[in-house]
Amino acid sequence: MFSFEKNSLKNTDKEIFDAIELEVKRQHEHVELIASENYASPAVMEAQGSQLTNKYAEGYHGKRYYGGCEFVDIAEKLAIERAQQLFGVDYANVQPHSGSQANAAVYNAVLKPGDTVLGMDLGAGGHLTHGSKVNFSGKIYNSIQYGLDENGDIDYEQVAQLAKEHKPKMIIAGFSAFSGIINWQKFREIADSVDAVLMADIAHVAGLVAAGVYPNPFPYVYVATTTTHKTLRGPRGGLILCNNNPELAKKFQSAIFPGIQGGPLMHVIAAKAVAFKEALEPSFVDYQKQVLKNAKAMEKVLKQRGINIISGGTSNHLLLLDITNTGFSGKEAEAALGRANITVNKNSIPNDPRSPFVTSGLRIGSPAITTRGFKEKECELVANLLADVVFNCGDEKVENETAAKVLDLCDKLPVYK
């Protein structure tokens, strides 16, 4: 028998307790600019930390291989219904443990090993699971990669040419570091021309799509995958969506279970349901609109400070910065900004001469700081502070002065009250 007091984390494992406390402190004291990160609400975290973690529930709601699933069934059913409502679709699978798992399931459902897949090149802003040679998607399947044109937009002419030449079975429209807007209709026209399945990976923009401030990939795509954190502000997890295609939906269902997963994480699914409910509130639309405004505010200042932005700017929540002209690498800038209490990630830029472990760029985004309550004024300040550090990496005085300003800003707008 457990006692919530006697068997608390603090009493049971002081090392892990202290590590968590330090991370809580870091989140409070640092400005979070990593585009793929966000802050989950107390309600989401409460659901994820619940006793639902104890329940095994192989199968799907109403069709389990274990007894005692009547209450976790409620959680999964709510998560599915809310996801369907949020994205306007008739099928949602809430069981994928991650976005990569969701993508792997789609591959398994519609392709055979060796089939050709056309996706965005990692160096141009794509994701590992879009055909990178170091990933399963580039090892099991014949991966062909497209990139950006001279204006920093997706090179649709190249996509069409590669599709015509290689006849892919599936085309992936999506990204990990692209600040533009995807033309779903154009992708569908190209996919139809070679009879390919069109998949959208909306992991980065799912919240924007749900709020109606970024184009919805439906009805143009056969299937969409996403993570449930990032702009959706839920727990870390994955999601598969499709509409008006029961045959494909059946394949996705079996591709997850028993295809690549066993027991679902019911505590995470409950947390997803909570996040979807929050995203259905009118305030979520206001939040996503502010995400876009804040990204634009940072864009304006960074351009004024002489930092080059790939694609010329941003039309979503993220900015990919080319910092070559600063004389410092992405690795150096990431470390310097970290010392100044600004968290970013180094990122390759198109045709980057440096390795992915060093890079010539930084990727930043506005979702987390917007959740924190930052508006345009604060984002302009943050962009100026970022520029101060990036042009002076290693300058202890600049880094310390910046850290002090960041701490003051963070104290005024805490993540959790």
UniProtKB/Swiss-Prot annotation:
GO molecular function: glycine hydroxymethyltransferase activity; pyridoxal phosphate binding
HAMAP family, sorted: SHMT
Organism annotation: Francisella tularensis subsp. holarctica (strain LVS)
The reaction(s) this protein catalyses: (6R)-5,10-methylene-5,6,7,8-tetrahydrofolate + glycine + H2O = (6S)-5,6,7,8-tetrahydrofolate + L-serine
SUPFAM superfamilies the UniProt entry points to: PLP-dependent transferases
Disulphide linkage map: none
Protein's UniProt name: Serine hydroxymethyltransferase
Cofactors (names): pyridoxal 5'-phosphate
UniProt similarity note: Belongs to the SHMT family.
Function: Catalyzes the reversible interconversion of serine and glycine with tetrahydrofolate (THF) serving as the one-carbon carrier. This reaction serves as the major source of one-carbon groups required for the biosynthesis of purines, thymidylate, methionine, and other important biomolecules. Also exhibits THF-independent aldolase activity toward beta-hydroxyamino acids, producing glycine and aldehydes, via a retro-aldol mechanism.
GO cellular component, one term: cytosol
NCBIfam families associated with the record: PRK00011.1 (NF000586)
Subunit structure as annotated in this protein's UniProt entry: Homodimer.
Alphabetical UniProt keywords: Amino-acid biosynthesis, Cytoplasm, One-carbon metabolism, Pyridoxal phosphate, Transferase
UniProt-listed PROSITE patterns: SHMT
Enzyme Commission numbers on file: 2.1.2.1
Keyword Cytoplasm (UniProt): yes
Residues with PTM N6-(pyridoxal phosphate)lysine: 230
Residues holding (6S)-5,6,7,8-tetrahydrofolate: 122, 126-128, 355-357
Marked site positions, Plays an important role in substrate specificity: 229
Subcellular localization(s) per the UniProt record: Cytoplasm
The organism's place on the tree of life at top rank: Bacteria
